[in-house]
């Protein structure tokens, strides 16, 4: 498989201890540079080592959405490089068309509808379904908006509930955010949706960002590790850093933003489950 784009992964220090099984924080940001230069960065913040491995999947792979007859079946149209947490769920990846998908924690997610009989799609393979089937954000939005399947989200091996939302970007700079609210899929689609973190729901994050934009990033920025603060900082810096069509400049620029929103190693706040150490970062030159 010839990948026309680059997927770079920088892993944090190896885990020295296993923290209590509470979930985490993450940040995703898309760099929109000149001459179509698009780079997507992401941090993985988790209170324990998620045992991430990288896999190269070829096009033409037959897949199923869950271990049940009442599921979704497909054959991958695109090869991809994917990151798997605990070797059971795809959290991050890029396909050969340059489409990037990032799965981040969102505890408010509700996938279930009463009496839902649609085919099952496991949350652990939802990201890979997108990477397998779509070359652009437009394609992903058009198909996923039909809501042909229901998401099944079993607990993680450490007992944590799987409550996540998905961000997708493509080489044109287009983006979409997919969230499940009360069993319904809500989609935010457009180049302006460059950043995603965690709680609260995305429309509330945008309202918080609007407040800080009135203040101005050069005047003051929120500095904690909380998801809304990281959202504001990433939104400011991803547009404030130098813009260049040269990947040797653009990629380090995105990595510098990812470092700014990373959580120092060893940080664990028992009463604030969204503050966890950054385990690794990815930067995708699309």
Locations of regions flagged by a protein language model:
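N-terminal signal peptide c-region/cleavage motif recognized by signal peptidases
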Residues: 20-21
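Proteins synthesized as precursors that undergo proteolytic processing into mature forms
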Residues: 120-153, 247-256
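Bacterial N-terminal signal peptides that target proteins for export
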Residues: 1-10
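Hydrophobic helical h-region of N-terminal Sec-dependent signal peptides
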Residues: 12-16
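Structural recognition of the beta-strand scaffold that forms the well-ordered cores
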Residues: 39-41, 100-103, 167-169, 177, ...
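C-terminus-biased signal that marks the final domain/tail of proteins
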Residues: 24-39, 53, 63, 152-154, ...
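Catalytic cofactor-binding cores of redox enzymes
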Residues: 146-182
């Amino acid at each position: 498989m010839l990948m026309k784009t680059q997927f770079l992964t920088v892993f944090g220090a190896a885990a020295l201890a296993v923290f209590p099984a509470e979930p985490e924080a993450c940040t995703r940001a898309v760099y929109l540079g000149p001459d179509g230069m698009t780079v997507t960065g992401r941090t993985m913040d988790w209170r324990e080592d998620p045992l991430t491995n990288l896999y190269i999947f070829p096009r033409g792979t037959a897949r199923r959405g869950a271990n049940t007859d009442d599921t979704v079946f497909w054959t991958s149209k695109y090869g991809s490089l994917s990151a798997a947490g605990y070797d059971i769920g795809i959290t991050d990846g890029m396909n050969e068309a340059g489409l990037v998908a990032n799965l981040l924690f969102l505890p408010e997610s509700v996938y279930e509808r009463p009496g839902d009989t649609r085919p099952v799609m496991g949350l652990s393979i939802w990201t890979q379904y997108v990477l397998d089937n779509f070359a652009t954000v437009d394609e992903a939005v058009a198909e996923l908006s039909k809501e042909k399947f229901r998401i099944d989200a079993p607990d993680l091996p450490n007992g944590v509930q799987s409550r996540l939302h998905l961000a997708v970007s493509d080489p044109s700079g287009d983006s979409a955010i997919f969230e499940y609210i009360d069993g319904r899929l809500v989609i935010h689609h457009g180049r302006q949706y460059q950043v995603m973190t965690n709680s609260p729901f995305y429309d509330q994050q945008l309202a918080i960002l609007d407040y800080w934009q009135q203040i101005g990033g050069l005047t003051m920025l929120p500095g904690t590790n909380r998801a809304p603060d990281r959202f504001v900082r990433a939104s400011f810096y991803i547009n404030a850093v130098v813009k260049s069509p040269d990947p040797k400049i653009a990629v380090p620029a995105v990595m510098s933003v990812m470092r700014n929103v990373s959580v120092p190693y060893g940080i664990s706040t028992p009463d604030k489950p969204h503050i966890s150490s950054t385990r690794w970062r990815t930067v995708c030159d699309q």
